[in-house]
Amino acid sequence: MSDSPRRLTHVDESGAARMVDVSGKDVTARTATASGRVLVSETVVGLLRGEGVPKGDALGVARVAGIMAAKQTPTLIPLCHPLSISGVSVDLEVTDDPEPSVAIRATVKTTDRTGVEMEALTAVSVAALTVVDMVKAVDKAAVVTDIRVETKTGGKSGDWSRP
């Protein structure tokens, strides 16, 4: 790691927000994986594992919502670059460990000049919000939590994994 001082890249010298110029960066293969959870009641876990919730296929709808959201990231987050996304996978798992929840994991891939961490985070966030929407008739207390980047590969800064 360099000894040079670190700074926020989306802020110019005067403190104004700016979109980073990536035109001089190399086009490389890049991936990012993010995760998150929706804490739900035991009743919701039972419904998701069995007959389903009143609104329908909660996990299927959340998966598609996450994929769609990844593609909309630059529309939702002002300083994100529009990218050519090569692939998005969103996986949801109903679990009791360590507590009743829906675990969400999204991986986004591109070959471009900047990374896809924000796209992966957006996919997880919107998938989680969709789970809440799908189960709220049964569990108004559902909680979205623990959204974070797990890994990223490619680019000038190289690979990174959450310790």
Curated annotation (Swiss-Prot):
Q: For binding substrate, which residues are annotated in this chain's numbering?
A: 79-81, 118-119
The enzyme's main class, written as a single word, is lyase
| Pathway(s) the chain acts in | Cofactor biosynthesis; molybdopterin biosynthesis
Q: Which reaction equations make up its catalytic activity?
A: (8S)-3',8-cyclo-7,8-dihydroguanosine 5'-triphosphate = cyclic pyranopterin phosphate + diphosphate
EC number(s) stated in the UniProt entry for this protein: 4.6.1.17
**What are the positions of the active site?**
133
Presence of keyword Cell membrane: no
InterPro entries, alphabetized: MoaC, MoaC_bact/euk, MoaC_sf, MoCo_biosynth_MoaA/MoaC, Mopterin_CF_biosynth-C_dom
Record-level GO BP terms: Mo-molybdopterin cofactor biosynthetic process
Q: Which UniProt keywords apply?
A: Lyase, Molybdenum cofactor biosynthesis
Q: Which domain of life is it from?
A: Bacteria
MF term (GO), any: cyclic pyranopterin monophosphate synthase activity
Whom does it interact with, and what assembly results?
Answer: Homohexamer; trimer of dimers.
Q: What does this protein do?
A: Catalyzes the conversion of (8S)-3',8-cyclo-7,8-dihydroguanosine 5'-triphosphate to cyclic pyranopterin monophosphate (cPMP).
Give the family this protein belongs to, as stated in its UniProt record: Belongs to the MoaC family.
Cross-referenced HAMAP family: MoaC_B
Q: What is this protein called?
A: Cyclic pyranopterin monophosphate synthase
Originating organism: Nocardioides sp. (strain ATCC BAA-499 / JS614)
Lineage runs: Bacteria, Bacillati, Actinomycetota, Actinomycetes, Propionibacteriales
Which gene is annotated as encoding this protein in its UniProt record? moaC
